[in-house]
Amino acid sequence: MDPIDVTYHDEVGFLDDKNRNWQDWIMKLLLLAKKEIGKDNNLEMSINFVDEDRSHEINLKYRDKDRPTDVISFAIEDGEDAIDLSVFEDDPDFQEDIGDLFMCPSVIKRHSKEYGTGFDREFGYTVVHGFLHLNGYDHIKPDEAKEMFGIQGKVLEECGLPLYPDQLDEGRGK
């Protein structure tokens, strides 16, 4: 499978944890999700770890939500303005930039306690959820939600972080 080139920006020191290689685990999640949605080209994206103030600021400015959130995604292709990438199909060095994620570890930790999922499960859910948004998936309509949360569930299960029966509707907590 072709790789995903991830650029990290860590404003909160999340990746400094010497007891865990977060980047390897994130890559495992991303590659499983990429395989699950049938993407076979080279991808690039960024993941930005931010504090609650920054998450709140971004969420208010771009989503009109007056609170911090776990993840905000900014997809390069959003809506009907899709870019025709077929001109690059014969270029093995071309990387499709899918966008940027802004993740807030402290909100993810709080959600893991609220939903009773544990940090690893909630973090994995959030990474995959954001990645799917960058690739055009959404959960506004029930049929879209079923597809998106189904993909999340399969990826998490492959990582040993299965969804519980009462979480299948949203792919998340209780």
UniProtKB/Swiss-Prot annotation:
Keyword Heme attached: no
Gene Ontology cellular component annotations, sorted alphabetically: cytoplasm
InterPro entries: MetalPrtase_cat_dom_sf_prd (IPR023091), YbeY (IPR002036), YbeY_CS (IPR020549)
UniProt keyword annotations, A-Z: Cytoplasm, Endonuclease, Hydrolase, Metal-binding, Nuclease, Ribosome biogenesis, rRNA processing, Zinc
Cofactor notes: Binds 1 zinc ion.
Pfam families (alphabetical): YbeY
Names of required cofactors: Zn(2+)
One Gene Ontology biological process: rRNA processing
Compartment list: Cytoplasm
Main location: cytoplasm
Entry EC number(s): 3.1.-.-
Binding-site positions, Zn(2+): 129, 133, 139
Listed GO MF terms: metalloendopeptidase activity; RNA endonuclease activity; zinc ion binding
PANTHER family noted in UniProt: ENDORIBONUCLEASE YBEY, CHLOROPLASTIC (PTHR46986:SF1)
Family: Belongs to the endoribonuclease YbeY family.
Function: Single strand-specific metallo-endoribonuclease involved in late-stage 70S ribosome quality control and in maturation of the 3' terminus of the 16S rRNA.
Stated name of the protein: Endoribonuclease YbeY
Organism: Lactobacillus helveticus (strain DPC 4571)
